[in-house]
Amino acid sequence: MDEFEYAIFEEEDEEVEGEDDVKLAEIYKLASKLLKLLDEIKSFELKESASLMLIKEIVGDDKVLVGLATKMLQDMSYGFDDDESYVS
């Protein structure tokens, strides 16, 4: 890991003004950018670590969200996410 330099970034307090649909559009835009950046990471280990870090940051301490994410990942691992007739 000595080959990488890490910069500490201050959290931006940039507020997105507008209704929920405007905020959702901004979330989608940022998520798309994050996914593109993840795809560009050459190291599989770093890509896995960054992906898990994002999941942990998003889920946080919200027990309901942890349960929903767990169920979604379980459904994906069993291939149920491709079945349109399947209801979780």
Swiss-Prot record:
Top-level taxon in the UniProt lineage: Archaea
Protein name stated in the entry: Uncharacterized protein AF_2230
